């Protein structure tokens, strides 16, 4: 039976981001109806970590909004990492905090963070069409810094931003050059507050994207993330094909600003596809 890894997300700093990423409701350039807060209370984060681990999550990603890591964010993420690791939950801790230099990433590594998530999002050529406040090259350099720091790299992208198939191939080729251990695959969902005007990908096109990702990243853990609930809706037959086509990890629970599937029901559905839940990241 195929083994599936479950990963979960905690949005520990939300909203008020000065970047203008056209796909993100956390940008202050868009008027997204989201919760905004500076730093989530440590006790709340610990409760989330315990609850999600009990449900079977092996990965736990601490996400902060904003362009990049700074001293305050570094100290906060380090504090959370130490507190979670003291619980001895056996969670693989991931930080996702934007652009970061080598010294910052080494600091997080030493504090107990195991991997760093920084998505390329799309191709180098298409990126300027969805963001003008930072460059694709900055993203790529941060990924390289994570690897140099001895952290695991989690890096992927978004499909359905009006990019071409050539852009998808270019992004996947760039990701392959980084050899990430995990690649999140997101499907863009249209939102009236965001400037990207496009129709949601069909389930068939989304499956083609997964097949393409598997071709370029045969050894990466391909993790289906945002958009799964909308693209596949109640189409169990096509959702099950995700795992036939290469997906072997799933985001369990909510995303940054949108609701995910109810964890227990999601796990029941995954089991009904003949999948088993991994009990170790290794």
UniProtKB/Swiss-Prot annotation:
The keyword Methyltransferase does not apply. Pathway: Cofactor biosynthesis; biotin biosynthesis; biotin from 7,8-diaminononanoate: step 2/2. Residues 1-228 form the Radical SAM core domain. It comes from the Bacteria. [2Fe-2S] cluster binds at residues 61, 96, 154, 221. [4Fe-4S] cluster binds at residues 17, 21, 24. GO terms for biological process: biotin biosynthetic process. Its cofactor is [4Fe-4S] cluster; [2Fe-2S] cluster. Keywords: 2Fe-2S, 4Fe-4S, Biotin biosynthesis, Iron, Iron-sulfur, Metal-binding, S-adenosyl-L-methionine, Transferase. It catalyses: (4R,5S)-dethiobiotin + (sulfur carrier)-SH + 2 reduced [2Fe-2S]-[ferredoxin] + 2 S-adenosyl-L-methionine = (sulfur carrier)-H + biotin + 2 5'-deoxyadenosine + 2 L-methionine + 2 oxidized [2Fe-2S]-[ferredoxin]. Transmembrane segments: none annotated. Binds 1 [4Fe-4S] cluster. The cluster is coordinated with 3 cysteines and an exchangeable S-adenosyl-L-methionine. Homodimer. Belongs to the radical SAM superfamily. Biotin synthase family. Catalyzes the conversion of dethiobiotin (DTB) to biotin by the insertion of a sulfur atom into dethiobiotin via a radical-based mechanism. This is Biotin synthase.
């Amino acid at each position: 039976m195929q083994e599936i890894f479950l990963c979960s997300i905690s949005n520990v700093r939300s909203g008020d981001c000065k970047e203008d990423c056209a796909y993100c409701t956390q940008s202050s350039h868009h008027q997204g109806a989201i919760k905004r807060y500076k730093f989530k209370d440590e006790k709340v984060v610990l409760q989330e970590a315990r609850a999600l681990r009990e449900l079977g999550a092996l990965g736990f990603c601490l996400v902060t909004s904003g362009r990049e890591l700074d001293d305050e964010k570094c100290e906060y993420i380090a504090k959370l990492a130490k507190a979670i690791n003291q619980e001895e939950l056996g969670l693989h801790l991931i930080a996702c905090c934007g652009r970061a230099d080598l010294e910052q990433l080494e600091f997080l590594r030493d504090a107990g963070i195991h991997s760093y998530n920084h998505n390329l999002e799309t191709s180098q050529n298409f990126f300027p069409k969805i963001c003008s406040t930072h460059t694709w090259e900055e993203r790529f350099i941060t990924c390289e810094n994570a690897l140099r720091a001895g952290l695991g790299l989690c890096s992927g992208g978004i499909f359905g931003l009006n990019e071409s198939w050539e852009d998808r191939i270019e992004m996947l080729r760039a990701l392959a050059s980084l050899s990430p251990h995990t690649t999140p695959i997101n499907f863009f969902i249209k939102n009236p507050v965001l400037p990207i005007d496009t129709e949601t990908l069909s389930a068939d096109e989304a499956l083609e994207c997964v097949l393409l990702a598997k071709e370029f990243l045969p050894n990466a853990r391909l993790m289906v993330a945002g958009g799964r609930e909308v693209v596949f809706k109640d189409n169990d037959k096509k959702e099950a094909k995700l795992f036939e086509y290469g997906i072997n990890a799933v985001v369990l629970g909510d995303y940054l600003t949108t609701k995910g599937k109810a964890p227990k029901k999601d796990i029941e559905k995954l089991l009904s596809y003949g999948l088993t839940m991994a009990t170790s990241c290794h």
